[in-house]
């Protein structure tokens, strides 16, 4: 397997939702940052789409004891908007994926700004960062299936879900696989040519 253990990876995914609330002061965000068994095109090389799937059950033994909600993975602002450790960030694992609910601090302007940005749909995508424990790769479908996630670090509101850091690790993984596939094709071509010359 070509992935590097303990290397943090980032993925952009589904939109945030502002739930209807009878409490007009509540600043709640909901979303599904991880959707199981759904192929996602991570990149394309030479017209071939390289996909990734997070398998149902991949989070079964995942360390989710302390992950956070932030913005853009804390790159421009280190604000922690919610955290599992203090129960301001809650999650459930369903058949569909990982669902989160974050209770933001209405007294903090940064929290109000994030809530407003999501409410106005200026920010409507999520991303997550994690470390892979186990994965498999299908050379025929060019699909990497993550079967076990070791640790979840954060779920993040992202301004641009396709910004470079979102899939740096995935692109390097798929670039390695693409190079291997090309080398295997070249080796098969040479072998066929040698066999033709021998007979």
Segments predicted by a language model, with ranges:
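Enriched but not universal
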Residues: 180-199
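Signature of dsDNA virion morphogenesis modules
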Residues: 1-180, 199
């Amino acid at each position: 397997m070509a992935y590097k253990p303990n290397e943090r990876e980032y993925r952009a995914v589904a939109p945030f939702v502002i739930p209807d609330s009878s409490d007009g002061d509540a600043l709640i965000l909901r979303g599904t940052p991880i959707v199981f068994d759904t192929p996602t095109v991570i990149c394309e090389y030479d017209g071939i789409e390289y996909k990734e799937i997070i398998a149902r059950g991949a989070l079964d033994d995942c360390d989710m004891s302390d992950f956070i909600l932030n913005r853009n993975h804390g790159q421009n602002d280190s604000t922690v908007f919610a955290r599992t450790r203090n129960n301001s960030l809650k999650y459930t694992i369903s058949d569909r994926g990982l669902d989160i609910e974050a209770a933001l601090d209405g007294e903090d302007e940064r929290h109000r700004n994030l809530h407003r940005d999501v409410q106005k749909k200026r920010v409507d995508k999520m991303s997550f960062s994690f470390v892979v424990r186990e994965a498999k790769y299908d050379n025929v479908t060019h699909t990497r299936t993550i079967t076990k996630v070791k640790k979840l670090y954060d779920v993040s509101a992202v301004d641009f879900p396709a910004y470079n850091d979102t899939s740096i690790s995935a692109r390097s993984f798929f670039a390695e696989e693409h190079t291997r596939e090309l080398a295997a094709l070249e080796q098969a071509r040479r072998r066929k040519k040698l066999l033709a010359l021998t007979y």
